[in-house]
Curated annotation (Swiss-Prot):
Cleavable signal peptide: none
Entry-linked InterPro entries: Ara_Isoase_C (IPR024664), AraA_central (IPR055390), AraA_N (IPR055389), AraA_N_sf (IPR038583), Fuc/Ara_isomerase_C (IPR004216), Fucose_isomerase_N/cen_sf (IPR009015), Lara_isomerase (IPR003762)
Highest classification ranks of the organism: Bacteria, Bacillati, Actinomycetota, Actinomycetes, Micrococcales
Organism: Paenarthrobacter aurescens (strain TC1)
Cofactor note: Binds 1 Mn(2+) ion per subunit.
Cofactor(s) the protein needs: Mn(2+)
One GO cellular component term: cytosol
Annotated metabolic or biological route of this protein: Carbohydrate degradation; L-arabinose degradation via L-ribulose; D-xylulose 5-phosphate from L-arabinose (bacterial route): step 1/3
Alphabetically ordered keywords of this record: Arabinose catabolism, Carbohydrate metabolism, Isomerase, Manganese, Metal-binding
One biological process term in Gene Ontology: L-arabinose catabolic process to xylulose 5-phosphate
NCBIfam families named in the record: PRK02929.1
Record-given protein name: L-arabinose isomerase
Role of this protein: Catalyzes the conversion of L-arabinose to L-ribulose.
Amino acid sequence: MPSATSNPANNTSLEQYEVWFLTGSQHLYGEDVLKQVAAQSQEIANALNANSNVPVKLVWKPVLTDSDAIRRTALEANADDSVIGVTAWMHTFSPAKMWIQGLDALRKPLLHLHTQANRDLPWADIDFDFMNLNQAAHGDREFGYIQSRLGVPRKTVVGHVSNPEVARQVGAWQRASAGWAAVRTLKLTRFGDNMRNVAVTEGDKTEAELRFGVSVNTWSVNELADAVHGAAESDVDSLVAEYERLYEVVPELKKGGARHESLRYSAKIELGLRSFLEANGSAAFTTSFEDLGALRQLPGMAVQRLMADGYGFGAEGDWKTAILVRAAKVMGGDLPGGASLMEDYTYHLEPGSEKILGAHMLEVCPSLTAKKPRVEIHPLGIGGKEDPVRMVFDTDAGPGVVVALSDMRDRFRLVANVVDVVDLDQPLPNLPVARALWEPKPNFATSAAAWLTAGAAHHTVLSTQVGLDVFEDFAEIAKTELLTIDEDTTIKQFKKELNWNAAYYKLAGGL
């Protein structure tokens, strides 16, 4: 049976990545000062590496003191696929004209760390030698100027590295950079086309490859069916045994049960999907209930399990949401919680206690719960195929964010809504799908009105692993519009932001 780790493209571990730590100075101060700069900058990098909120290893590089070294370092970072970004700090004054060629050449995300070696001023001992050595307040302003002059997108983090908030912000940016690295090399396989007549799941795949790097291509679902029907019975036996070990399988699906063959067919779908995606080097995929060809079931539990292993997925041919799910899987990598395809399905409209019930036909990722899912089989009602097998569970309560990606003709638009996932008010005994119930920020009416006004999609990724800040950093790295709906959102201000953005992106597109 293909394993979850046999597809290198599907790796979600942040240990595969590194971020280079660059320190700026100049020869003006002499070798003794440069040695101190090197020692202290290594201490800064080591302190961040020791912090659990910083998930990607910082690799310290020798102090940069001239234009050629800076440019070469930028080019080396560009050429190294394991490098997902660079962090830069001007320990002393580093004349910024030296950084022009390097910054112009840099193609990796950039974090400007504005810090200094000492937290406190040595009030009684400070002299001008100390001032010359510890002048990031001076040097980083010069660096900030040249970045703005060149229009370099970056994140700026301010404070001493002993401050937990500094490490948290550095970690959030690293996660966003990892998501970006995953998207830049993503191969996405579509089985069939989009659901007929649906608007928001359409989009410009060529523009997506230019903007995000993702390669989106389509295969006949019957090619998938061939892989499914070619699965070895011994592999099916092993996978079914795994299902019974990991999940609460209803009796009718167990060996000897009346519907056991349906569980075996679901296992064949998983085996076929895995082998097909591995052969393509794909880490994301889509299906469509309208285009199932020779498949006997709409892929349900197979999709849920592949998402749990880090694959991106979009339903009804929605490749844009599949991109988001894959990015969220990588960004959340080692954190508790999960990420999944989600769809706003229906509402609870009790005044003052409004909630959104999210679900999908089958395909919600079990990473959203720490509880043991129940494996069930029920009619689907659409698609004209056999009853599909699926995992059923309630998403665990906690903070989350739902994010959608839409093609607005002249640009892609991300819309993110901060939410609180809550426990169900009452059981849902007749709803045989995985689901999530949440309260959107700032309130239901404002959230829904803003979402509709923005033209945001009905398919989203729900992440309970990373928050809005990571998606904000991701959008900045991707140079993609992001509209946020959070505790501070008002419709009046939100409409103004939409108008400002429309003007900005039209002007920026012509520059």
